[in-house]
């Protein structure tokens, strides 16, 4: 979700992309320290931006046991159809974050005073959930 992230994450280190090297390290640490719990998910996760759906898809395929935090949905341009790739076939394995989209939802209300920010935030969080659930089935 950070436009300049490629300046570091897409550098080549040891013959591979830095972001791939980091994910490989997470897998090695998970295996070495036996950090996969009963759920099947590693205790070590990765942050993968919603605005890079092609990366979400390839990283989910390559790292099926790494939990993803997915920032960038909403205000930063990530869409529900993009974040669907962060989840496994059961709709598990990711948390989609939309801080600004939810915190600033009151600005889109009729009075835009912020007096009813809680209702606006709840409505936006529910809209986000429903939007994502159009693309992700949770089993």
What are these regions (language model features)?
Residues 31-33, 66-69, 139:
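Structural alpha-beta junctions
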Residues 14-18, 65-68, 87-90, 114-118:
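Short, low-complexity, polar/charged sequence segments that are solvent-exposed and flexible
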Residues 83-89, 104-139:
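C-terminal helical cap(s) of enzyme catalytic domains, especially alpha/beta-barrels
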Residues 27-31, 38, 59-63, 129, ...:
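Surface-exposed amphipathic alpha-helices with a cationic face
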Residues 1-45:
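Conserved anion-binding
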Residues 19, 23-27, 56, 80, ...:
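Generic structural signal for well-ordered alpha-helices
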Residues 46, 50-97, 101-105:
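A C-terminal functional module that forms or caps the active site or interfaces directly
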Residues 2-10, 96-97, 101-102, 106-108:
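Glycine-rich, positively charged active-site loop/lid region within alpha/beta enzyme cores that binds
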